[in-house]
Amino acid sequence: MKLLLCLGLTLVCIHAEEATSKGQNLNVEKINGEWFSILLASDKREKIEEHGSMRVFVEHIHVLENSLAFKFHTVIDGECSEIFLVADKTEKAGEYSVMYDGFNTFTILKTDYDNYIMFHLINEKDGKTFQLMELYGRKADLNSDIKEKFVKLCEEHGIIKENIIDLTKTNRCLKARE
């Protein structure tokens, strides 16, 4: 009986393991679908503040053969506008690149597929770089444990807590979603 219990707990732990794009266990197909922007962080805060070029709100990720297609919304002159971007796989395992306000490379830091996904992005433009981190959820908000995990990851990447914006308290263009 103890052996069965141990086996069952082991299987549960394996199933609950988080995936990362740098790890062997990421199944990119599982990130396909609807997402909501929850938290946004950057070491260059003005990029993610209201009217910042990187203040975009995800609606959908579509997994293609060698790329990821994103549907975003952004607020321009008080109106919600759609943005479509396609990020291509790079030669580095688990890394994607896309042109948007400069050249961006990003990886998936963590995901459990069913609730959340965390991205880390490096933007290069005119010889300058900054980093951006994003937390998306399958629902319009996430529990505080996941948010705290994201804050800790941001701090590990040198992004201070004051540069993390809770987008659940802002206009995320939810009414513009189809």
UniProtKB/Swiss-Prot annotation:
Localization annotation: Secreted
Keyword Cell membrane found: no
Described purpose of this protein according to its UniProt entry: Binds pheromones, likely to displace pheromones complexed to urinary MUPs and transport them to the vomeronasal organ (VNO) where they associate with their neuronal receptor(s). MUP4 is highly specific for the male mouse pheromone 2-sec-butyl-4,5-dihydrothiazole (SBT).
Protein name as it appears in the record: Major urinary protein 4
Any one biological process term the GO annotation gives: negative regulation of gluconeogenesis
Tissue-by-tissue expression: Expressed in lacrimal gland, parotid gland, sublingual gland, nasal mucus, and vomeronasal organ.
Gene Ontology CC terms: cytosol; extracellular space; nucleus
Membrane-crossing segments per the record: none
Disulfide topology: 80-173
SUPFAM superfamilies: Lipocalins
Signal peptide, first to last residue: 1-16
Superkingdom per UniProt: Eukaryota
Family the UniProt entry places it in: Belongs to the calycin superfamily. Lipocalin family.
Pfam families in alphabetical order: Lipocalin (PF00061)
Natural source organism: Mus musculus (Mouse)
CDD domains: lipocalin_MUP-like
InterPro entries named in the record: Calycin, Lipocalin, Lipocalin_CS, Lipocln_cytosolic_FA-bd_dom, Maj_urinary
Keyword field: Disulfide bond, Pheromone-binding, Secreted, Signal, Transport
One GO MF term: pheromone binding
